[in-house]
């Protein structure tokens, strides 16, 4: 048995088309959806990723502004930039791209992203709204996992789903989204002990821990659907996930590839969220700007 590959590219294309359609309608109404991406690093892989967002946005008819504040930017500088973007009417969506300079606190900075422009669900207020089932943008990667499961008609209601990783970017918000879909959700982390104890009996395993080869074939069963969220850059520049594909694919029922899986859907959702944010803001029904 060899696991079916769940490519994210066809789904990403569909979502990009949705974003493009909405952007076109907005443009006809006099609104050009605009995404601002704040960068504060010299990391080449980060700049490559940001450029890929810029290209995808251009193709969808969404304006993308890259604000590079430099790798030595202070927390105060970044706060000022985020405040300005949150107040700027022409900006509809804001992303604070990591990594950030040493000593800069990500969780402090994201509080200054206006919730109605928080298209990657970074502000803790967005996570809080998500927790109580209120309308808010979920982190794009977390939503991408759910969209993939829906696209391939993989049911989660009443099923055992294990999420490996508890970050505020993927693990925590994803567990909330899965609970909303009535999944029986378990979140594993560095203190959980032997991973296979939890994953081997799971119907769906989502791995988002940032560790190459964390999940192996010994940790899954023949009915497991494995979603690999990991994006790890190897010394040769190639990209790999958190799953040891060589050992997992002969065992599991289905597996998302890296690259070409969750990542492509994530980028498409950032564009769709931007278009949706622009629509909400054009109706003047968005939440008030968070101030401090």
Swiss-Prot record:
One of its GO terms (biological process) is methionine biosynthetic process. CDD domains: NAD_bind_m-THF_DH_Cyclohyd (cd01080). Homodimer. One of its GO terms (cellular component) is cytosol. InterPro entries: Aminoacid_DH-like_N_sf, NAD(P)-bd_dom_sf, THF_DH/CycHdrlase, THF_DH/CycHdrlase_cat_dom, THF_DH/CycHdrlase_NAD-bd_dom. Its EC number is 1.5.1.5, 3.5.4.9. Coiled coil: none annotated. Transmembrane segments: none annotated. GO terms for molecular function: methenyltetrahydrofolate cyclohydrolase activity; methylenetetrahydrofolate dehydrogenase (NADP+) activity. This is Bifunctional protein FolD. It comes from Arthrobacter globiformis. The keyword Signal does not apply. It catalyses: (6R)-5,10-methylene-5,6,7,8-tetrahydrofolate + NADP(+) = (6R)-5,10-methenyltetrahydrofolate + NADPH; (6R)-5,10-methenyltetrahydrofolate + H2O = (6R)-10-formyltetrahydrofolate + H(+). Pathway: One-carbon metabolism; tetrahydrofolate interconversion. Catalyzes the oxidation of 5,10-methylenetetrahydrofolate to 5,10-methenyltetrahydrofolate and then the hydrolysis of 5,10-methenyltetrahydrofolate to 10-formyltetrahydrofolate. Belongs to the tetrahydrofolate dehydrogenase/cyclohydrolase family. Disulfide bonds: none annotated. The lineage of its organism: Bacteria, Bacillati, Actinomycetota, Actinomycetes, Micrococcales. Keywords: Amino-acid biosynthesis, Histidine biosynthesis, Hydrolase, Methionine biosynthesis, Multifunctional enzyme, NADP, One-carbon metabolism, Oxidoreductase, Purine biosynthesis.
């Amino acid at each position: 048995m060899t696991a079916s590959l769940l490519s994210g590219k066809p789904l990403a294309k569909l979502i990009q088309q949705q974003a493009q359609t909405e952007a076109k309608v907005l443009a006809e109404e006099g609104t050009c959806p605009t995404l601002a991406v704040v960068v504060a690093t010299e990391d080449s892989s980060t700049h490559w990723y940001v450029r890929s967002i810029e290209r995808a946005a251009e193709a969808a008819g969404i304006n993308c502004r890259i604000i590079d504040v430099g790798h030595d930017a202070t927390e105060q500088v970044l706060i000022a930039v985020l405040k300005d973007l949150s107040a700027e009417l022409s900006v509809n969506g804001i992303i604070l791209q990591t990594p950030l300079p040493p000593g800069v606190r990500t969780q402090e900075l994201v509080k200054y992203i206006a919730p109605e422009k928080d298209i990657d669900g970074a502000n803790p207020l967005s996570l809080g709204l998500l927790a109580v089932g209120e309308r808010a943008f979920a982190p794009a990667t977390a939503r991408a996992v759910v969209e993939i499961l829906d696209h391939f008609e993989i049911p989660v209601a009443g099923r055992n789903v294990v999420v490996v990783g508890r970050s505020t970017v993927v693990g925590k918000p994803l567990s909330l989204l899965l609970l909303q879909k009535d999944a029986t959700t378990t979140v594993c982390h560095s203190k959980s002990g032997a991973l296979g104890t939890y994953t081997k009996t799971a119907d769906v395993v989502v791995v988002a821990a940032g560790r190459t080869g964390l999940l192996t074939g010994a940790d899954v069963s023949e009915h497991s659907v494995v979603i690999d969220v990991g994006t790890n850059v190897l010394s040769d520049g190639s990209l790999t996930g958190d799953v040891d594909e060589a050992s997992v694919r002969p065992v599991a029922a289905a597996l998302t590839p890296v690259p070409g899986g969750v990542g492509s859907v994530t980028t498409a959702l950032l564009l769709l969220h931007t278009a949706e944010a622009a629509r909400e803001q054009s109706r003047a029904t968005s939440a008030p700007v968070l101030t401090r």
